[in-house]
Amino acid sequence: MNKRAAIQRAKIKMKILLSNDDGVYAQGIHALADALRDLAEIVIVAPDRNRSGASNSLTLEHPLRVSQIAENTYSVQGTPTDCVHFALNELMKDALPDLVLSGINHGANLGDDVLYSGTVAAAMEGHFLGVQSIAFSLAGTTHFASAAHFVRQLVEQHLANPIPTNRLLNVNIPDRPLELIQGIEVTRLGARHHAESMIKQKDPRGHDIYWLGPPGKEQDAGPGTDFHAIERGWVSLTPLQVDLTAHESLRSMDHWLKEKVNG
């Protein structure tokens, strides 16, 4: 079966859940939906407002309020993780989607950004709950059409030849016109320096208030990293795993514990 036939066959039953952390009205999620409507049934479940930086947080102290604002489009008073959790465990529990896609984020999620990112967290929740998931981020706020092109390319490739891993994928697209993007590279996460200092100001009543400083500059941004790909005009595709265990340290830590505590 050729690629076109495989895509046409998959379209008959394909269903995709979309979420994000920029909010249900954000430009990125609608660019994502528009790029895929003729490929699949699209369901949008996203926060009612911007929840950037929410990471994997869940709402535990009050109920989630959900509003249907259009056909197959739902606004949730909660975090990105809440949205995907609600969608897969309630809204779509009797017919789970084939893919969970998060984004298109308004700004890159590179290196250790992924630890804070609500965009990545929404995809991670889909992964936790057993659905192939991909997070998409645009390294800026202008060329959403370029990002949508690569979203569609990757989804079509998945339809014709399913992604050969059960890992979560983190995809970043340069904020450039399509003709200036070189292609797609598989990368690893880079790393930043520590974030800059807090910014102290006064509120109108003279009380001290504090803003988080901007993210740190790139520290590990050499060849093979997601930072390096984006800087050179390539789309970065990074497979992520949920297991945070430092496996290479297990033996040395076991030795240290026995030597210092038990010996």
From Swiss-Prot:
A divalent metal cation binds at residues 21-22, 52, 105. It is found in: Cytoplasm. GO terms for molecular function: 3'-nucleotidase activity; 5'-nucleotidase activity; exopolyphosphatase activity; metal ion binding; nucleotide binding. InterPro entries: SurE, SurE-like_Pase/nucleotidase, SurE-like_sf. Its EC number is 3.1.3.5. Its cofactor is a divalent metal cation. Keywords: Cytoplasm, Hydrolase, Metal-binding, Nucleotide-binding. GO terms for cellular component: cytoplasm. It is an enzyme of class 3 (hydrolase). It catalyses: a ribonucleoside 5'-phosphate + H2O = a ribonucleoside + phosphate. Binds 1 divalent metal cation per subunit. Pfam families: SurE. Nucleotidase that shows phosphatase activity on nucleoside 5'-monophosphates. HAMAP family: SurE (MF_00060). Belongs to the SurE nucleotidase family. This is 5'-nucleotidase SurE.
